[in-house]
């Protein structure tokens, strides 16, 4: 698509994103100084980190938040969306008291979620209407709405979709440049996305090496990405604390359940389904919450049908995405695997494995790329099975009704 088409799509996505933000926050909370909707600890904590950062002078590294209590570390270790915090600090003398950019950020997350999901589906269908309707399945997902409710920086799921768009697109021109930009930007939003994107980049790069045996390009590609990433992380303050301080308790606790895609509840007090019952899980698995929604669960059955209609060709064609999903699922389920409340496996990891894995203590979040791959390929399968369009609308309505409580 040409630049004009992309611009129009982006503007429309922003308009839809703004409308969704009004529904999400309420019209009265759209202002950039309104804090009444800060009811979650994480949102309040992020706001305080931003306030301290804006009221401090510039330091080096640029993200240093020296007055933030006893922490005295970088803004990147808060959830205050570092890239927006840095931009806000440039203009801090012109900003109102109690300023925050959170409604703008939520609008951008909704908008880019629509933008990239539309482009992914359009890449396979070349159908504008189908792609637009499909994009709303990526918006009305519990994992996105749940995160935007209190973990603002972790609402940037569009980063995952943007990366998949690069890999799934037929146009590979300048893909290395776009990958560097995307992975670098992710480090200015939240490091969990950086780990996910870098892992995906390394995986696909290695897969291409196995296919084409181009060792020179494999090395060059990953060195360029790594240098760009490390330099960015250095300038914004990732290394102001010792690496050992990033290790901690959590891996094997903040994980995902084997039934996470079908379990609408991550605690006894919350449910995301009007129709499906709470399956049950164990403490800590809220980080791996991955309920698809009834509409998407039904949609995924069409993916299963499509796969088995042409089993061998489908497996060969999508082997790399199957392997990638297995890797992320293993990380999300960890060494302590549960089916509902029942503990299936609990392996004791040696220290040399547990220590590096402790960096991703909330490993349940690694379910997200798999979650979006399920939606992407389910929508593509639905289209290729030539099912009447009105049934897709029906599934979207079912999804909305199911999430209504």
For each of these PLM feature ranges, what is it?
Residues 40, 232-304:
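Periplasmic/ER-lumenal interhelical loops and adjacent helix-loop junctions
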Residues 20-112, 141-145, 151, 155, ...:
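Membrane-interface coil-to-helix junctions
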Residues 202, 223-227, 326, 376, ...:
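Signature aromatic-anchored transmembrane alpha helix within multi-pass, membrane-resident enzymes
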Residues 1-30, 220-227, 305, 309-325:
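Start-transfer (signal-anchor) and selected internal transmembrane alpha helices
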Residues 293-315, 325-330, 375:
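Hydrophobic, aromatic-rich transmembrane alpha-helices
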Residues 77-81, 100-110, 137-162, 188-196, ...:
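Membrane-interface micro-motifs in multi-pass membrane enzymes
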Residues 107, 111-120, 129-170, 175-208, ...:
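Membrane-embedded helix bundles of polyisoprenyl
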Residues 22-28, 132-150, 233-243, 264-271, ...:
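Membrane-interface helix-loop junctions at the exits of transmembrane helices
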